[in-house]
Amino acid sequence: MKNLLALIICSISLLSNLKAQTYPSLNINLLAHLNPETDNTGNDNRKYSGCWGWYQAAKNKEYAIVATSSKTYFIDVTNPAAPIICDSVKALKNGCTWREVKNYQNYCYIVSDDNPPNSFQIVDMQYLPDSVHVVHSGTTYFERSHTIFVDHNRLYCGAPKDVVTGYESPMRVYSLANPENPVLLRRLEDDISNTQIDYVHDMFVRNDTIFASTGWKGLQILKFDTLTNHFSLIQTYDGYPYDGYNHSSWQTDNRKTMVFADEVPASLPAKVIDVSDLNNIMIVDTINSHALATPHNPYIVGNNWCWISTYQDGIYLYDISNPSNTTVHGYFDTHPQHGVNDNFSTSAYRGNWGAYPYLPSKIIIACDMQNGIFILEGDVNYTNPVSVKENVKQPSTFSVYPNPASNEINFLIANQFHKTITCVITDMLGKVVLENSFIINDDFYKTVININSLKNGCYFVTLKGTNSNETKKIIIQH
């Protein structure tokens, strides 16, 4: 009881300076801000890394699970304006940079990828809000892992490393049939050669399909046969426009669209890809808060919303209901001291690490490496979207292809624009870079525009007719 009282007092104290700092935002509100980690910071004053959330159905409570440089915090956010730190689990190693958390049922799994000594931890959360119980903290399974992902009763580990030999596996899968005692099902290298995949940085898993972010080897799509416990390679997606170190990804619920981020070099945009046909993956859009910003981790909610942690630019919310024409719906700058949106451009990897937008209340947990834990809420359009009937988009009146394009773009135009139409291409700043007019007489009209004079980048193509005006986004990559 004394410990709980101390934690409540600590939480109130940590919230007392909430209004002292101004955080630029659009359509996202700050409910609470905590900064409990004050010791044992990592490189560049990094105190916070991965975060997750858990809904305790038996008690109708919501929790934020936050990994820091020295421990993992369990925070009651049922009343998001007054969060309470319930308990914390100390790590074997202090001053960590990389720590990630996920849950299966009432169990939390914690990994770190910092140098030894390190450990894998399993924590039973069923006793919250009173306390949590550590059921495993050691190196029996592995010592380090860069990332983890839980799908059904399986734990996927990216780049786990053994304590004795130092051997690093690209990826392993463990059964969580007994959540306190994971059982190794398969190593990726047992089925796929290291020449093909030698490292898995992160992964998104749905049923038997794994989208593995493999760094410089792009996005590798795998199947894990849950009957035979074997991997097979479905597709490799690399060499795409603005490619870099493929870092992380997330997929829409309807499995048609995926968003992924390339972390290195800095300032590469996130990619929106069509994955409805895994044999014909296509980039349909690229998104970034600003030209020099760096997306880190995407999180898709349903089919229409994508949150992206964007380091020094904070966290951004994108409307991806039309994947080929995504728009910024909102943002919250968790790192106002730096960032492109604060007129301070730098390639340093500081600021917002990750988020968790999946609690029933729809509040958002966001972690800034230097600035702490943010409890946020979206506007009414996010929390209570209009009905499907009200939100139906009108059918497109023209198509443009290929996208990305290199030398020319093709148009197929429906005659809803009537006889004379004007094509206007603008850059991301709204400057007109190309303009053309057509006269069409058929129900469908095809034409080609040469784009050799345009530089690589993202552009908006607008067709203007008598009664129609429609815009699409294209990518030019020579």
Ranges and model annotations:
Residues 13-15, 374:
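Residues within alpha-helical transmembrane segments of multi-pass membrane proteins, especially transporters
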Residues 4-13:
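Sec-dependent N-terminal signal peptides
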Residues 20-385:
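Feature marking well-ordered beta-strand scaffolds used for ligand recognition
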Residues 391-401, 405-478:
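C-terminal outer-membrane/trafficking sorting elements
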Residues 377-399:
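Extracellular/periplasmic ectodomains of large secreted or surface enzymes and adhesion receptors
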Residues 17-22, 388, 430, 478:
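Bacterial Sec-dependent N-terminal signal peptides
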